[in-house]
Amino acid sequence: MAASGEEDMSELSPAAAPNLDWYEKPEETHAPEVDLETVIPPAQEPSNPAEPFCPRDLVPVVFPGPVSQEDCCQFTCELLKHILYQRHQLPLPYEQLKHFYRKVPQAEDTARKKAWLATEARNRKCQQALAELESVLSHLRDFFARTLVPQVLILLGGNALSPKEFYELDLSRLAPFGVDQGLNTAACLRRLFRAIFLADPFSELQTPPLMGTIVMVQGHRDCGEDWFQPKLNYRVPSRGHKLTVTLSCGRPSVPAMASEDYIWFQAPVTLKGFHE
């Protein structure tokens, strides 16, 4: 999935590209997208009330080389879908929901179509939730095409300033472009979700009620984004259950980006959970 460095630099906004002279190109090539949501079933869990952030709630993932900006977007989208399922905001993994709730019988199959129409009203909530999630995923892809994204926040419950749970994806240590060929996307996803599985961050959490989910992304202030709404004074919450997933690509560390050039943007849609 990796695009050429020349193409990436022409599409992204003014953030400087990291120096990748240290990196030797891998021999791997990209594989088709894999669905990892079904690998880890939802946690069955006793309770852990909201509490200040504890440093142990950290999942570090190190890739053996740089990845593309498109891959960074895919990591974000897959993590969002995974969290919604693990935290019981979706009754099934995203891909299964798309299959079961979007499969309309053929017109000639009258009996099946009547049965489907009888349950269609009950499916509207699911269809609306899927449409909103697909909209967020689509606009995330557009956003990642515009700018480097150092951080992503997935906020569950409460509001953007004081969520009940929040999940941080730290992409600031990655060198996301400047190479002709990146790592195998499917292998990177397996590495990411294996690290999450081993950390087992959901097992001690109580099954939550249905909650709203807010997506925040950090990007260059001059990226020209018009769907995600800029939040100039936003600060990452300091309370609530927090899990941080940090992605890096080994040595050397990526040069720090000027913090004043990057601001938070909030999705204008709050994703609503639903049960069957």
Curated annotation (Swiss-Prot):
Pfam family, any one: p31comet
Cellular compartments per GO CC: cytoplasm; nuclear membrane; nucleolus; nucleoplasm; nucleus; spindle
Principal subcellular localisation of the protein: nucleus
Annotated stretches, region: Disordered: 1-30
Job of this protein: May function to silence the spindle checkpoint and allow mitosis to proceed through anaphase by binding MAD2L1 after it has become dissociated from the MAD2L1-CDC20 complex.
Membership in a protein family: Belongs to the MAD2L1BP family.
Name of this chain's protein: MAD2L1-binding protein
Protein species of origin: Mus musculus (Mouse)
